[in-house]
Amino acid sequence: MHDIKSIRDNPQAFDAAFTRRGLAPIADSLIKLDETRRIAIIASEQAQARRNAASKEIGEAKKAKDNARAEALMAEVTELKTTMPALDEAVKAADAALKKALSEIPNLPLAEVPQGADEHGNVVRSHFGAPRSYAFTPKPHYELGEALGQMDFEAAAKMSGARFVVLKKGLARLERAIGQFFLDVHTGEHGYTEVNPPLLVKDDAMFGTAQLPKFSNDQFRVDTEEIQIKSAYEEFEKAKNAILNYVEEAGIKSAREEKLEVLGFAYEPNPDRRWLIPTAEVSLTNLVRESILDEKELPMRLTALTPCFRAEAGAAGRDTRGMIRQHQFTKVELVSITTPEQSKDEHERMLACAEEVLRRLGLHYRVMTLCTGDMGFASQKTYDIEVWMPGQGEGGAYREISSCSVCGDFQARRMDARSRGPDGKPRFVHTLNGSGTAVGRALIAVIENYQQEDGSIAVPDALLPYMGGLKVIANS
């Protein structure tokens, strides 16, 4: 969320940064919404002040035995009592309109972020290692896994539908080993505190990290009541004329008013609604919501290994085979809470932590600095780590395995997460998040990079302590 005061103070600078994302200038419209809100607040405050003054004057008029004035003042107070609720509602409506507008626009890119329209504008920052050489044509992970009898997409589809997988035997253990290895390095060597967070969160938590309201269609929602409301609204649309006629005939209220009420009810935020987390970033970052931290405690570094759930609404037709794009996957998340002065250095540190676990697995990768047109909604700057997968496409391909982003105070404002420095004044913290890394994609990378000509998978040295003596995953 952006600070409307900063936008009002320097709209040109805001629009200059905002339009770098390929979006139209928006500062003027935001300022107009803010002006409407401020006018509504002034009108409400003036009415309240006049009511207080008139109430005091009534006593003075009665004391002076000026009954005519007292009665006139009482009539004025009565009228103010009647009009003030509408003024208060106007304030709420104007405030909600501004908040909605601010909540739906992305963060501003830092000045050093490269300009670009999409992924083609991303810039290679560095490489590690080189692609492995094979005396045979490398196969994709799903062919290897199915041939081993340890990766079952058909069974998963029967119980859950498309974009799910059942892992068995050595591959199931290998995935568990990868996640455990990542956690051990991040907690034992990189200074992160392990957290076991909830997988179900409320609207406010998803709003805080900016998954809501803009990306609701990409999430899995768990709310029977909401589903019933949506279904009822769809039925309402199908039989709209009959229902509106019934409402008018029943005399409940005008058809137009009733329709608006139904629309509002169907989409009103529900405090009882829950969402499956798309990433542990949501749970970890929200640990500091509505709090004031001592800056001596910062940076705060948190990590979690959790299942993640994504609807992949915009991924139709992409990566339909294999484990690359699943509705459910496992990921180790890294989150840092810092001061504004620390956040840039912390971003570099987080990237190094994510790189380290891939280096120890002996995986070739490259680091990309994302351009303005490819960054996430809440990000000021993002590094992507793309690991080499020799079984992808024709001759192999780089695939994203980690994104490390600095968000500035964008999420902190949505969560009201602040810190108190030496001067004692609260200020918004900065938040960072990154994958450390995606366990499912790391599994794919290990399978494809460590495949052998007979279809077996050699276990990387770093994972041997977690595999119970299993050095090669073969068809048993």
Curated annotation (Swiss-Prot):
EC numbers, comma separated: 6.1.1.11
GO MF terms, alphabetically ordered: ATP binding; serine-tRNA ligase activity
Matching CDD domains: SerRS_core
Keyword Ribonucleoprotein: no
Gene Ontology biological process terms from the UniProt entry: selenocysteine biosynthetic process; seryl-tRNA aminoacylation
Residues annotated for L-serine binding in this entry: 279-281, 333, 435
Binding site for ATP: 310-312, 400-403
UniProt keywords, alphabetically: Aminoacyl-tRNA synthetase, ATP-binding, Cytoplasm, Ligase, Nucleotide-binding, Protein biosynthesis
Key word S-adenosyl-L-methionine present: no
Reactions performed catalytically: tRNA(Ser) + L-serine + ATP = L-seryl-tRNA(Ser) + AMP + diphosphate + H(+); tRNA(Sec) + L-serine + ATP = L-seryl-tRNA(Sec) + AMP + diphosphate + H(+)
Principal cellular location given in the protein's record: cytoplasm
Gene3D superfamilies with a match to the protein in the record: Bira Bifunctional Protein, Domain 2, Serine-tRNA synthetase, tRNA binding domain
InterPro entries linked: aa-tRNA-synt_IIb, aa-tRNA-synth_II, aa-tRNA-synth_II/BPL/LPL, Ser-tRNA-ligase_type_1, Ser-tRNA-synth_1_N, SerRS_1_N_sf, SerRS_core, tRNA-bd_arm
Domain note: Consists of two distinct domains, a catalytic core and a N-terminal extension that is involved in tRNA binding.
NCBIfam families xref list: serS
Reported function: Catalyzes the attachment of serine to tRNA(Ser). Is also able to aminoacylate tRNA(Sec) with serine, to form the misacylated tRNA L-seryl-tRNA(Sec), which will be further converted into selenocysteinyl-tRNA(Sec).
Subunit structure: Homodimer. The tRNA molecule binds across the dimer.
Protein name: Serine--tRNA ligase
Species of provenance: Rhodopseudomonas palustris (strain BisA53)
